[in-house]
Amino acid sequence: MFWGVTQVSAQKDSIYIEAKLSSDKKNLEVKQEIVYYNHSDKDLHTVKLLNWVSAYNRRGTSLVYRKLEDRNNDLHFAKADQLGKLLELDIKNSENETIPIAALSDENLFLPLKEALKPGESITLQLHYRMQLPDTKFTGYGTSGQAAVLKYFFIVPDHFDPDNISKRNYHDIEESVSFNTFWTVNFDIPVNSFVEGNLPQVQMNSFKGYLDSDPEFLISLSQYPSIKNNIDGSDIEVKFGYNLKPEEKQNLEFYLPLHLKFLKEKLGSLPESIFISDKFRAKEDFFGNNDITFWKFRFPLFTDAEKTDLDYFGIITKKILDESVIADKEKDHWFKNGLKSYLEIQYLKKFYQDTKLLGMLPETKIFGIKPLKLFHASKVKLLDRYGLAYQYIMLQNLDQKIDEHFPVLSNFNDMAISSFETGSLFNYSAEKMGEGPFNDIVKNYVTKNSGKRITPEEFLADLSAKNKSASYLSDFFKQKNRVDFKLRNIRKEDDSLQIKIAKNTSASIPVKLETETKEGEKKVYWIDTEENQRITNVSLPASDNIYKVTLNSGYIFPESNYRDNFLYAKGLFSNAKKIKLKLIKDIPNPEYNEIYISPRVRFNNTYDKFLLGVNLKNQSFFDQKFLYSVTPTYSTGTGKLTGSGAVSYSIMPAESIIRSLTFGVSGAYFHYDYGLAYRKGSIASTLNFRKNPRSTVSRSIGASYNYFERDLSPKMIANNDYSKYNLWSLGYGYSDSQMIHEKSLSLSTQGMEDFNKITAEGFYRWEFAPKQKLSLRLFAGYFLRNNTRNDLFDYGISRVSNYSFSYTLLGESASSGLLSQQFILADGGFKSFLPGTVNQWITSVNVDSSIWKIFHVYADAGVYKNKDLPAKFIWDSGIKVRIIPDFLEVYFPVQSSLGFEPSFKDYAKRIRYTLVLNLGSIINAARRGWY
């Protein structure tokens, strides 16, 4: 059956497969022969085979953990019949002797060899195995009942590990492992089914040929379309693993030849056929060109033809790179990703040079006007997307170095760093040296390494040899960078303009300088900077009538700060930046110092009622190191002026155990009771430790000093209440917001002249079934010293004392009525109205569990002790209804230390609720899984 396979190639592996798919498409039986060569330079005593279907076989595999990081728990909660697993496996050597394996569930099968396999020699392995295919909803591969998508299920050698010693688990990252192999695959499939794949089809259900990527097959009840193209006399067929709408197919028949011709000019050659699966299309399409839908309204950014063009250029580009370039994705992901983005940039320059990032959306009229025209975002070019994505993540200090191993790259950095930043740097080099020479280097490198595993450092070396100004790239890719070019000043000397450019790096990086006259005439100069020299002086003729000078316009280079790249040579703002007032938060325009002035209307509490005011701040959609915000308001409840203000500065070292160190000063003036105001002044510092952007773990240390002044009522004055007090606090916080086991811990100490206390709080939430959770909170508080005059600073049992004005309470001083029923999970955390406060120590536990849909049960128990009184045990229980989880929830007490509460006449007054109106919390919850 397998005769002649070894004759295909002297040094290339061969795999022969006969695969039979069951009628329900859930089981696959495979008879297989592998001719494996020792590609290392040493004797092999074991051969490793990848058994990646076992990545789907249980909880706890690397694949399950990665999916949970992506906020996807489908595989974790999968039923047994949805999992993938190896059911049987028999492996024999060329002497028909069975080779033992450790376990069918292992993703890496290490086979002991009877005799050492010398370098260059081959071994023939006979395999017979049967597997259960996983559900396609987990990774896009497996079975859906209607179709089977086969990729990474055949047992194959790992060509990136010629020594056969390192484990490589499946992470669903589209990595090639069985490249440079001759495949023969014959299928036995259910009746009325069709099979398509990325191997040349030699007859019905049979495929044969070389692949530098992994084989992929689609077996379904439908025969999907294909489009044949003739490019410079060569026929290229593009096959699809999904249906095309008539309009989409018509558009593709027009655009695919353009794409393929463009790519052939840049890369030199094209494969004879291209297979695009539904999963590949979804992964590699153009990010950010989808229509915006809101309720029943749909706002298109681009026409259907433009979307097809943009989507499929990226899809086709990446598919061709995957088929023609052999790269270890774990280590060298940036090469193909960067080339894809570079080629996209070249395509956009040619066909979408002036197209805006928001497409035709700014032309949308609402009540006869075009409101988006007021935003700078409406003027940003589509080409700017590459630099903007890097800016967005870098300014949060959540970027990663370009050559970071792919498994630890966050999903957003896969796009923003591996693809966009690398592509921008390639484009930067191409603009400096000329696109023709750069494209020749790319074409020659890809052609030279056809059929071989690439070493991208060699590409960078070739680039540096042809263009010395690109020599910085090798080091640049190995670290997080914060390069900043700055226009220091412009001065006129005789008949020339002297321009001083500063950089914050010793590397020799060129900079693009652009001049512009008042009439809009532009000139471009490339300035080479010297190594170890941070100041560069440029002299330009004064006769050029230069009005404005710009460095690296259009976010062409990944800088840490574009705000110092613009200067005016003439006028009132010469050697300075102009100020621009804006009404609504926007993508920042680095040419201006922007101040956002926006009206504010919000409900504060029952005393201030609605606050009417205006907010002045410099915070755009992107983070900044220096931030200020001032919000004067008019309190409709008191008829007085109120407000708040804050100033902060953050230090964000690129390579450090610290992610950010922020210092801030703030102040506020509002009301906490009828006719009673408070004034608060704060000095605070927060240190956030560095986090792996894929990780859900965050750690921080915070310290603050707060000064308070409160107006007092006559009764409070008579009771010698506190009108002025100072609070010092120091705390440590740890949180892990992973999907199944969420946990957090906080430790803090707080004090003033009359007391010192320490507090600890732990929280754990377990998702034991889809959307069903059990949470446990532990709280402990202890006064080291307590000489206070009243219970203001005591620990609360069922109500918190908001003496620091840090909780959002609708009725700050309410003791009855609906406002007093607001619940804040703090201190003791009891939901029933258990009387009293605690002035010595308290411990409590709060338990909450799902029972059905939005209904939960809760129980609280604890022990507390007040001075000169014995310790007391308290408890409560009840039903919680999660109307909007974590934001609006209602508590119905049932049984507690007080008795059976529904029997009380005032039961309606005992119902509690939480109401969280925090947009930041919503945003943080939404972005989980991206970074």
Predicted regions and their residues:
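Extended, low-hydrophobicity, Ser/Thr/Pro/Gly-biased non-transmembrane segments
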Residues: 71-89, 102, 107, 126-218
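Juxtacatalytic substrate-recognition/specificity segment
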Residues: 185, 225-347, 559
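Beta-strand-rich binding/interaction modules
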Residues: 196, 274-275, 437-438, 465, ...
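Amphipathic alpha-helical substructures
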Residues: 271, 404-492
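Acidic/His/Gly-enriched intrinsically disordered linker/tail segments
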Residues: 335-424
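Outer-membrane beta-barrel initiation region
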Residues: 511, 519, 523, 527-529, ...
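C-terminal outer-membrane beta-barrel translocator/porin domains of Gram-negative envelope proteins
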Residues: 660-673, 686, 712, 725-850
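Outer-membrane beta-barrel "beta-signal"
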Residues: 881, 885-887, 908-931
